[in-house]
């Protein structure tokens, strides 16, 4: 018999893994109070209630039932707010961090001068950055997105810097010999070499941003998943906390499965 490839049967393995996790969850309830660790059926009921109950505000109206649930429910709107903030902070940090990383990787004098700044940025607590941004710019969307970008830029810059520094000088000389413009050199020389580093920084940064955005919403916003966690924590509604958690994780896994993994496979195709 031909052995299964990693892609074949992988779906069944993931399903069995989720079923095993659900079984462990139900068994763990025996050791805890149901109020502290509710049954999955209670979490499902809380999810349906949150998904079908309108929040204090609505995004927009739609006649389609699916989009009605997404846009008119508190769950759908809060997920939308959080995803927008995370996406804005992510793309801002990727652009700024990539530019900084390329410059540091190609110009050693800049790298030596700003190396201490990068180390400081990498070790600066995310919560401190968030509090300072809220103090300086108010409890606004701009302050939250700025805090997300500041926390992620050093990570992107470090990874892209390593890629830019590893580009062979001969390739740059060839580009100059063929009199390529700076844009053509960037597109034909730098970007193909840096693509794996872009993907590594994107995946690492995305994992970081998902965690930070919830904390910043918890302490300084009036919409979003983090803000809902604050309300449910105050009311000790554990099943609703878990309902929002599983919903958020599901969205993150969809992004990872259908966007990040295909792009990552493209980045590492040359290794096959």
Where are these regions (language model features)?
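Transmembrane alpha-helical segments of polytopic membrane transport and secretion proteins
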Residues: 1-19, 257-272
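Periplasmic/extracellular loop-to-transmembrane helix junction in inner-membrane transport proteins
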Residues: 2-3, 31-91
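Alpha-helical membrane-interface segments at transmembrane helix boundaries
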Residues: 76-84, 111, 118-121, 138, ...
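Transmembrane-helix boundary motif in ABC transporter permease subunits
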Residues: 84-118
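Generic hydrophobic transmembrane alpha-helix motif, especially the helices
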Residues: 115-152, 162
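Transmembrane alpha-helices
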Residues: 146, 150, 182-216, 239, ...
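Short cytoplasmic-facing helical segments at TM-TM junctions of multi-pass membrane proteins
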Residues: 155-201
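Hydrophobic alpha-helical transmembrane segments of polytopic membrane proteins
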Residues: 225-263
């Amino acid at each position: 018999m031909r052995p299964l490839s990693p892609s074949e049967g992988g779906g069944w393995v993931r399903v069995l893994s989720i079923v095993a996790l659900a079984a462990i969850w139900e068994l763990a309830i025996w050791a805890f109070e149901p109020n502290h660790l509710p049954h999955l059926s209670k979490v499902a009921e809380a999810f349906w209630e949150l998904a079908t109950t309108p929040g204090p505000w609505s995004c927009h109206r739609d006649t389609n039932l699916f989009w009605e649930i997404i846009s008119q429910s508190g769950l759908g709107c809060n997920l939308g707010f959080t995803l927008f903030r995370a996406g804005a902070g992510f793309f801002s940090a990727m652009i700024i961090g990539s530019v900084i990383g390329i410059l540091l990787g190609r110009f050693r004098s800049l790298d030596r001068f700003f190396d201490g700044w990068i180390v400081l940025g990498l070790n600066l607590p995310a919560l401190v950055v968030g509090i300072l941004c809220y103090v300086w710019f108010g409890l606004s969307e701009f302050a939250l997105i700025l805090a997300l970008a500041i926390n992620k830029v050093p990570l992107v810059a470090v990874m892209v810097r390593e890629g830019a520094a590893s580009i062979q000088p001969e390739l740059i000389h060839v580009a100059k010999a063929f009199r390529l413009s700076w844009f053509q050199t960037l597109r034909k020389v730098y970007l193909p070499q840096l693509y794996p580093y872009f993907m590594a920084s994107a995946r690492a940064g995305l994992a970081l941003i998902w965690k930070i955005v919830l904390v910043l919403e918890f302490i300084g916003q009036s919409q979003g998943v983090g803000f809902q966690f604050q309300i449910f924590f105050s009311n000790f509604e554990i099943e609703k906390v878990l309902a929002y958690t599983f919903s958020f994780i599901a969205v993150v896994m969809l992004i990872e499965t259908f966007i990040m993994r295909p792009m990552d496979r493209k980045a590492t195709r040359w290794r096959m």
